[in-house]
Amino acid sequence: MNKKISLHSSSGPVKKTGSVEFQIYHLTNQVIKLTSHLKQHSKDYSSQRGLWKMLGKRKRLLVYLSKNDINCYENLINKLGIRGLKIR
């Protein structure tokens, strides 16, 4: 299952790879890839740990982006099709 999400479909020039938006996009694609791997290999615990680490890093980046640029955050979660953060 090779489902990749495109960030640069209609957003104009390509963003730099160090930007927060690109890092979240890249982590999301890795999460999708690793999730499909874990559906076939459910006892691959080292991959599960890697998935949890990726999800934690993506969450921290989303928190940072939501605090600094809420419009970009909302656009990004809509493009990627991921849930927003829980507000406390």
Swiss-Prot record:
Keywords: Chloroplast, Plastid, Ribonucleoprotein, Ribosomal protein. InterPro entries: Ribosomal_uS15, Ribosomal_uS15_bac-type, uS15_NS1_RNA-bd_sf. Its main location: plastid. The keyword NAD does not apply. The gene is rps15. It comes from the Eukaryota. GO terms for cellular component: chloroplast; ribonucleoprotein complex; ribosome. Part of the 30S ribosomal subunit. This is Small ribosomal subunit protein uS15c. GO terms for biological process: translation. Gene3D superfamilies: S15/NS1, RNA-binding. Pfam families: Ribosomal_S15. It comes from Angiopteris evecta. It is found in: Plastid, Chloroplast. GO terms for molecular function: structural constituent of ribosome. PANTHER family: RIBOSOMAL PROTEIN S15, BACTERIAL AND ORGANELLAR, SMALL RIBOSOMAL SUBUNIT PROTEIN US15M. Belongs to the universal ribosomal protein uS15 family.
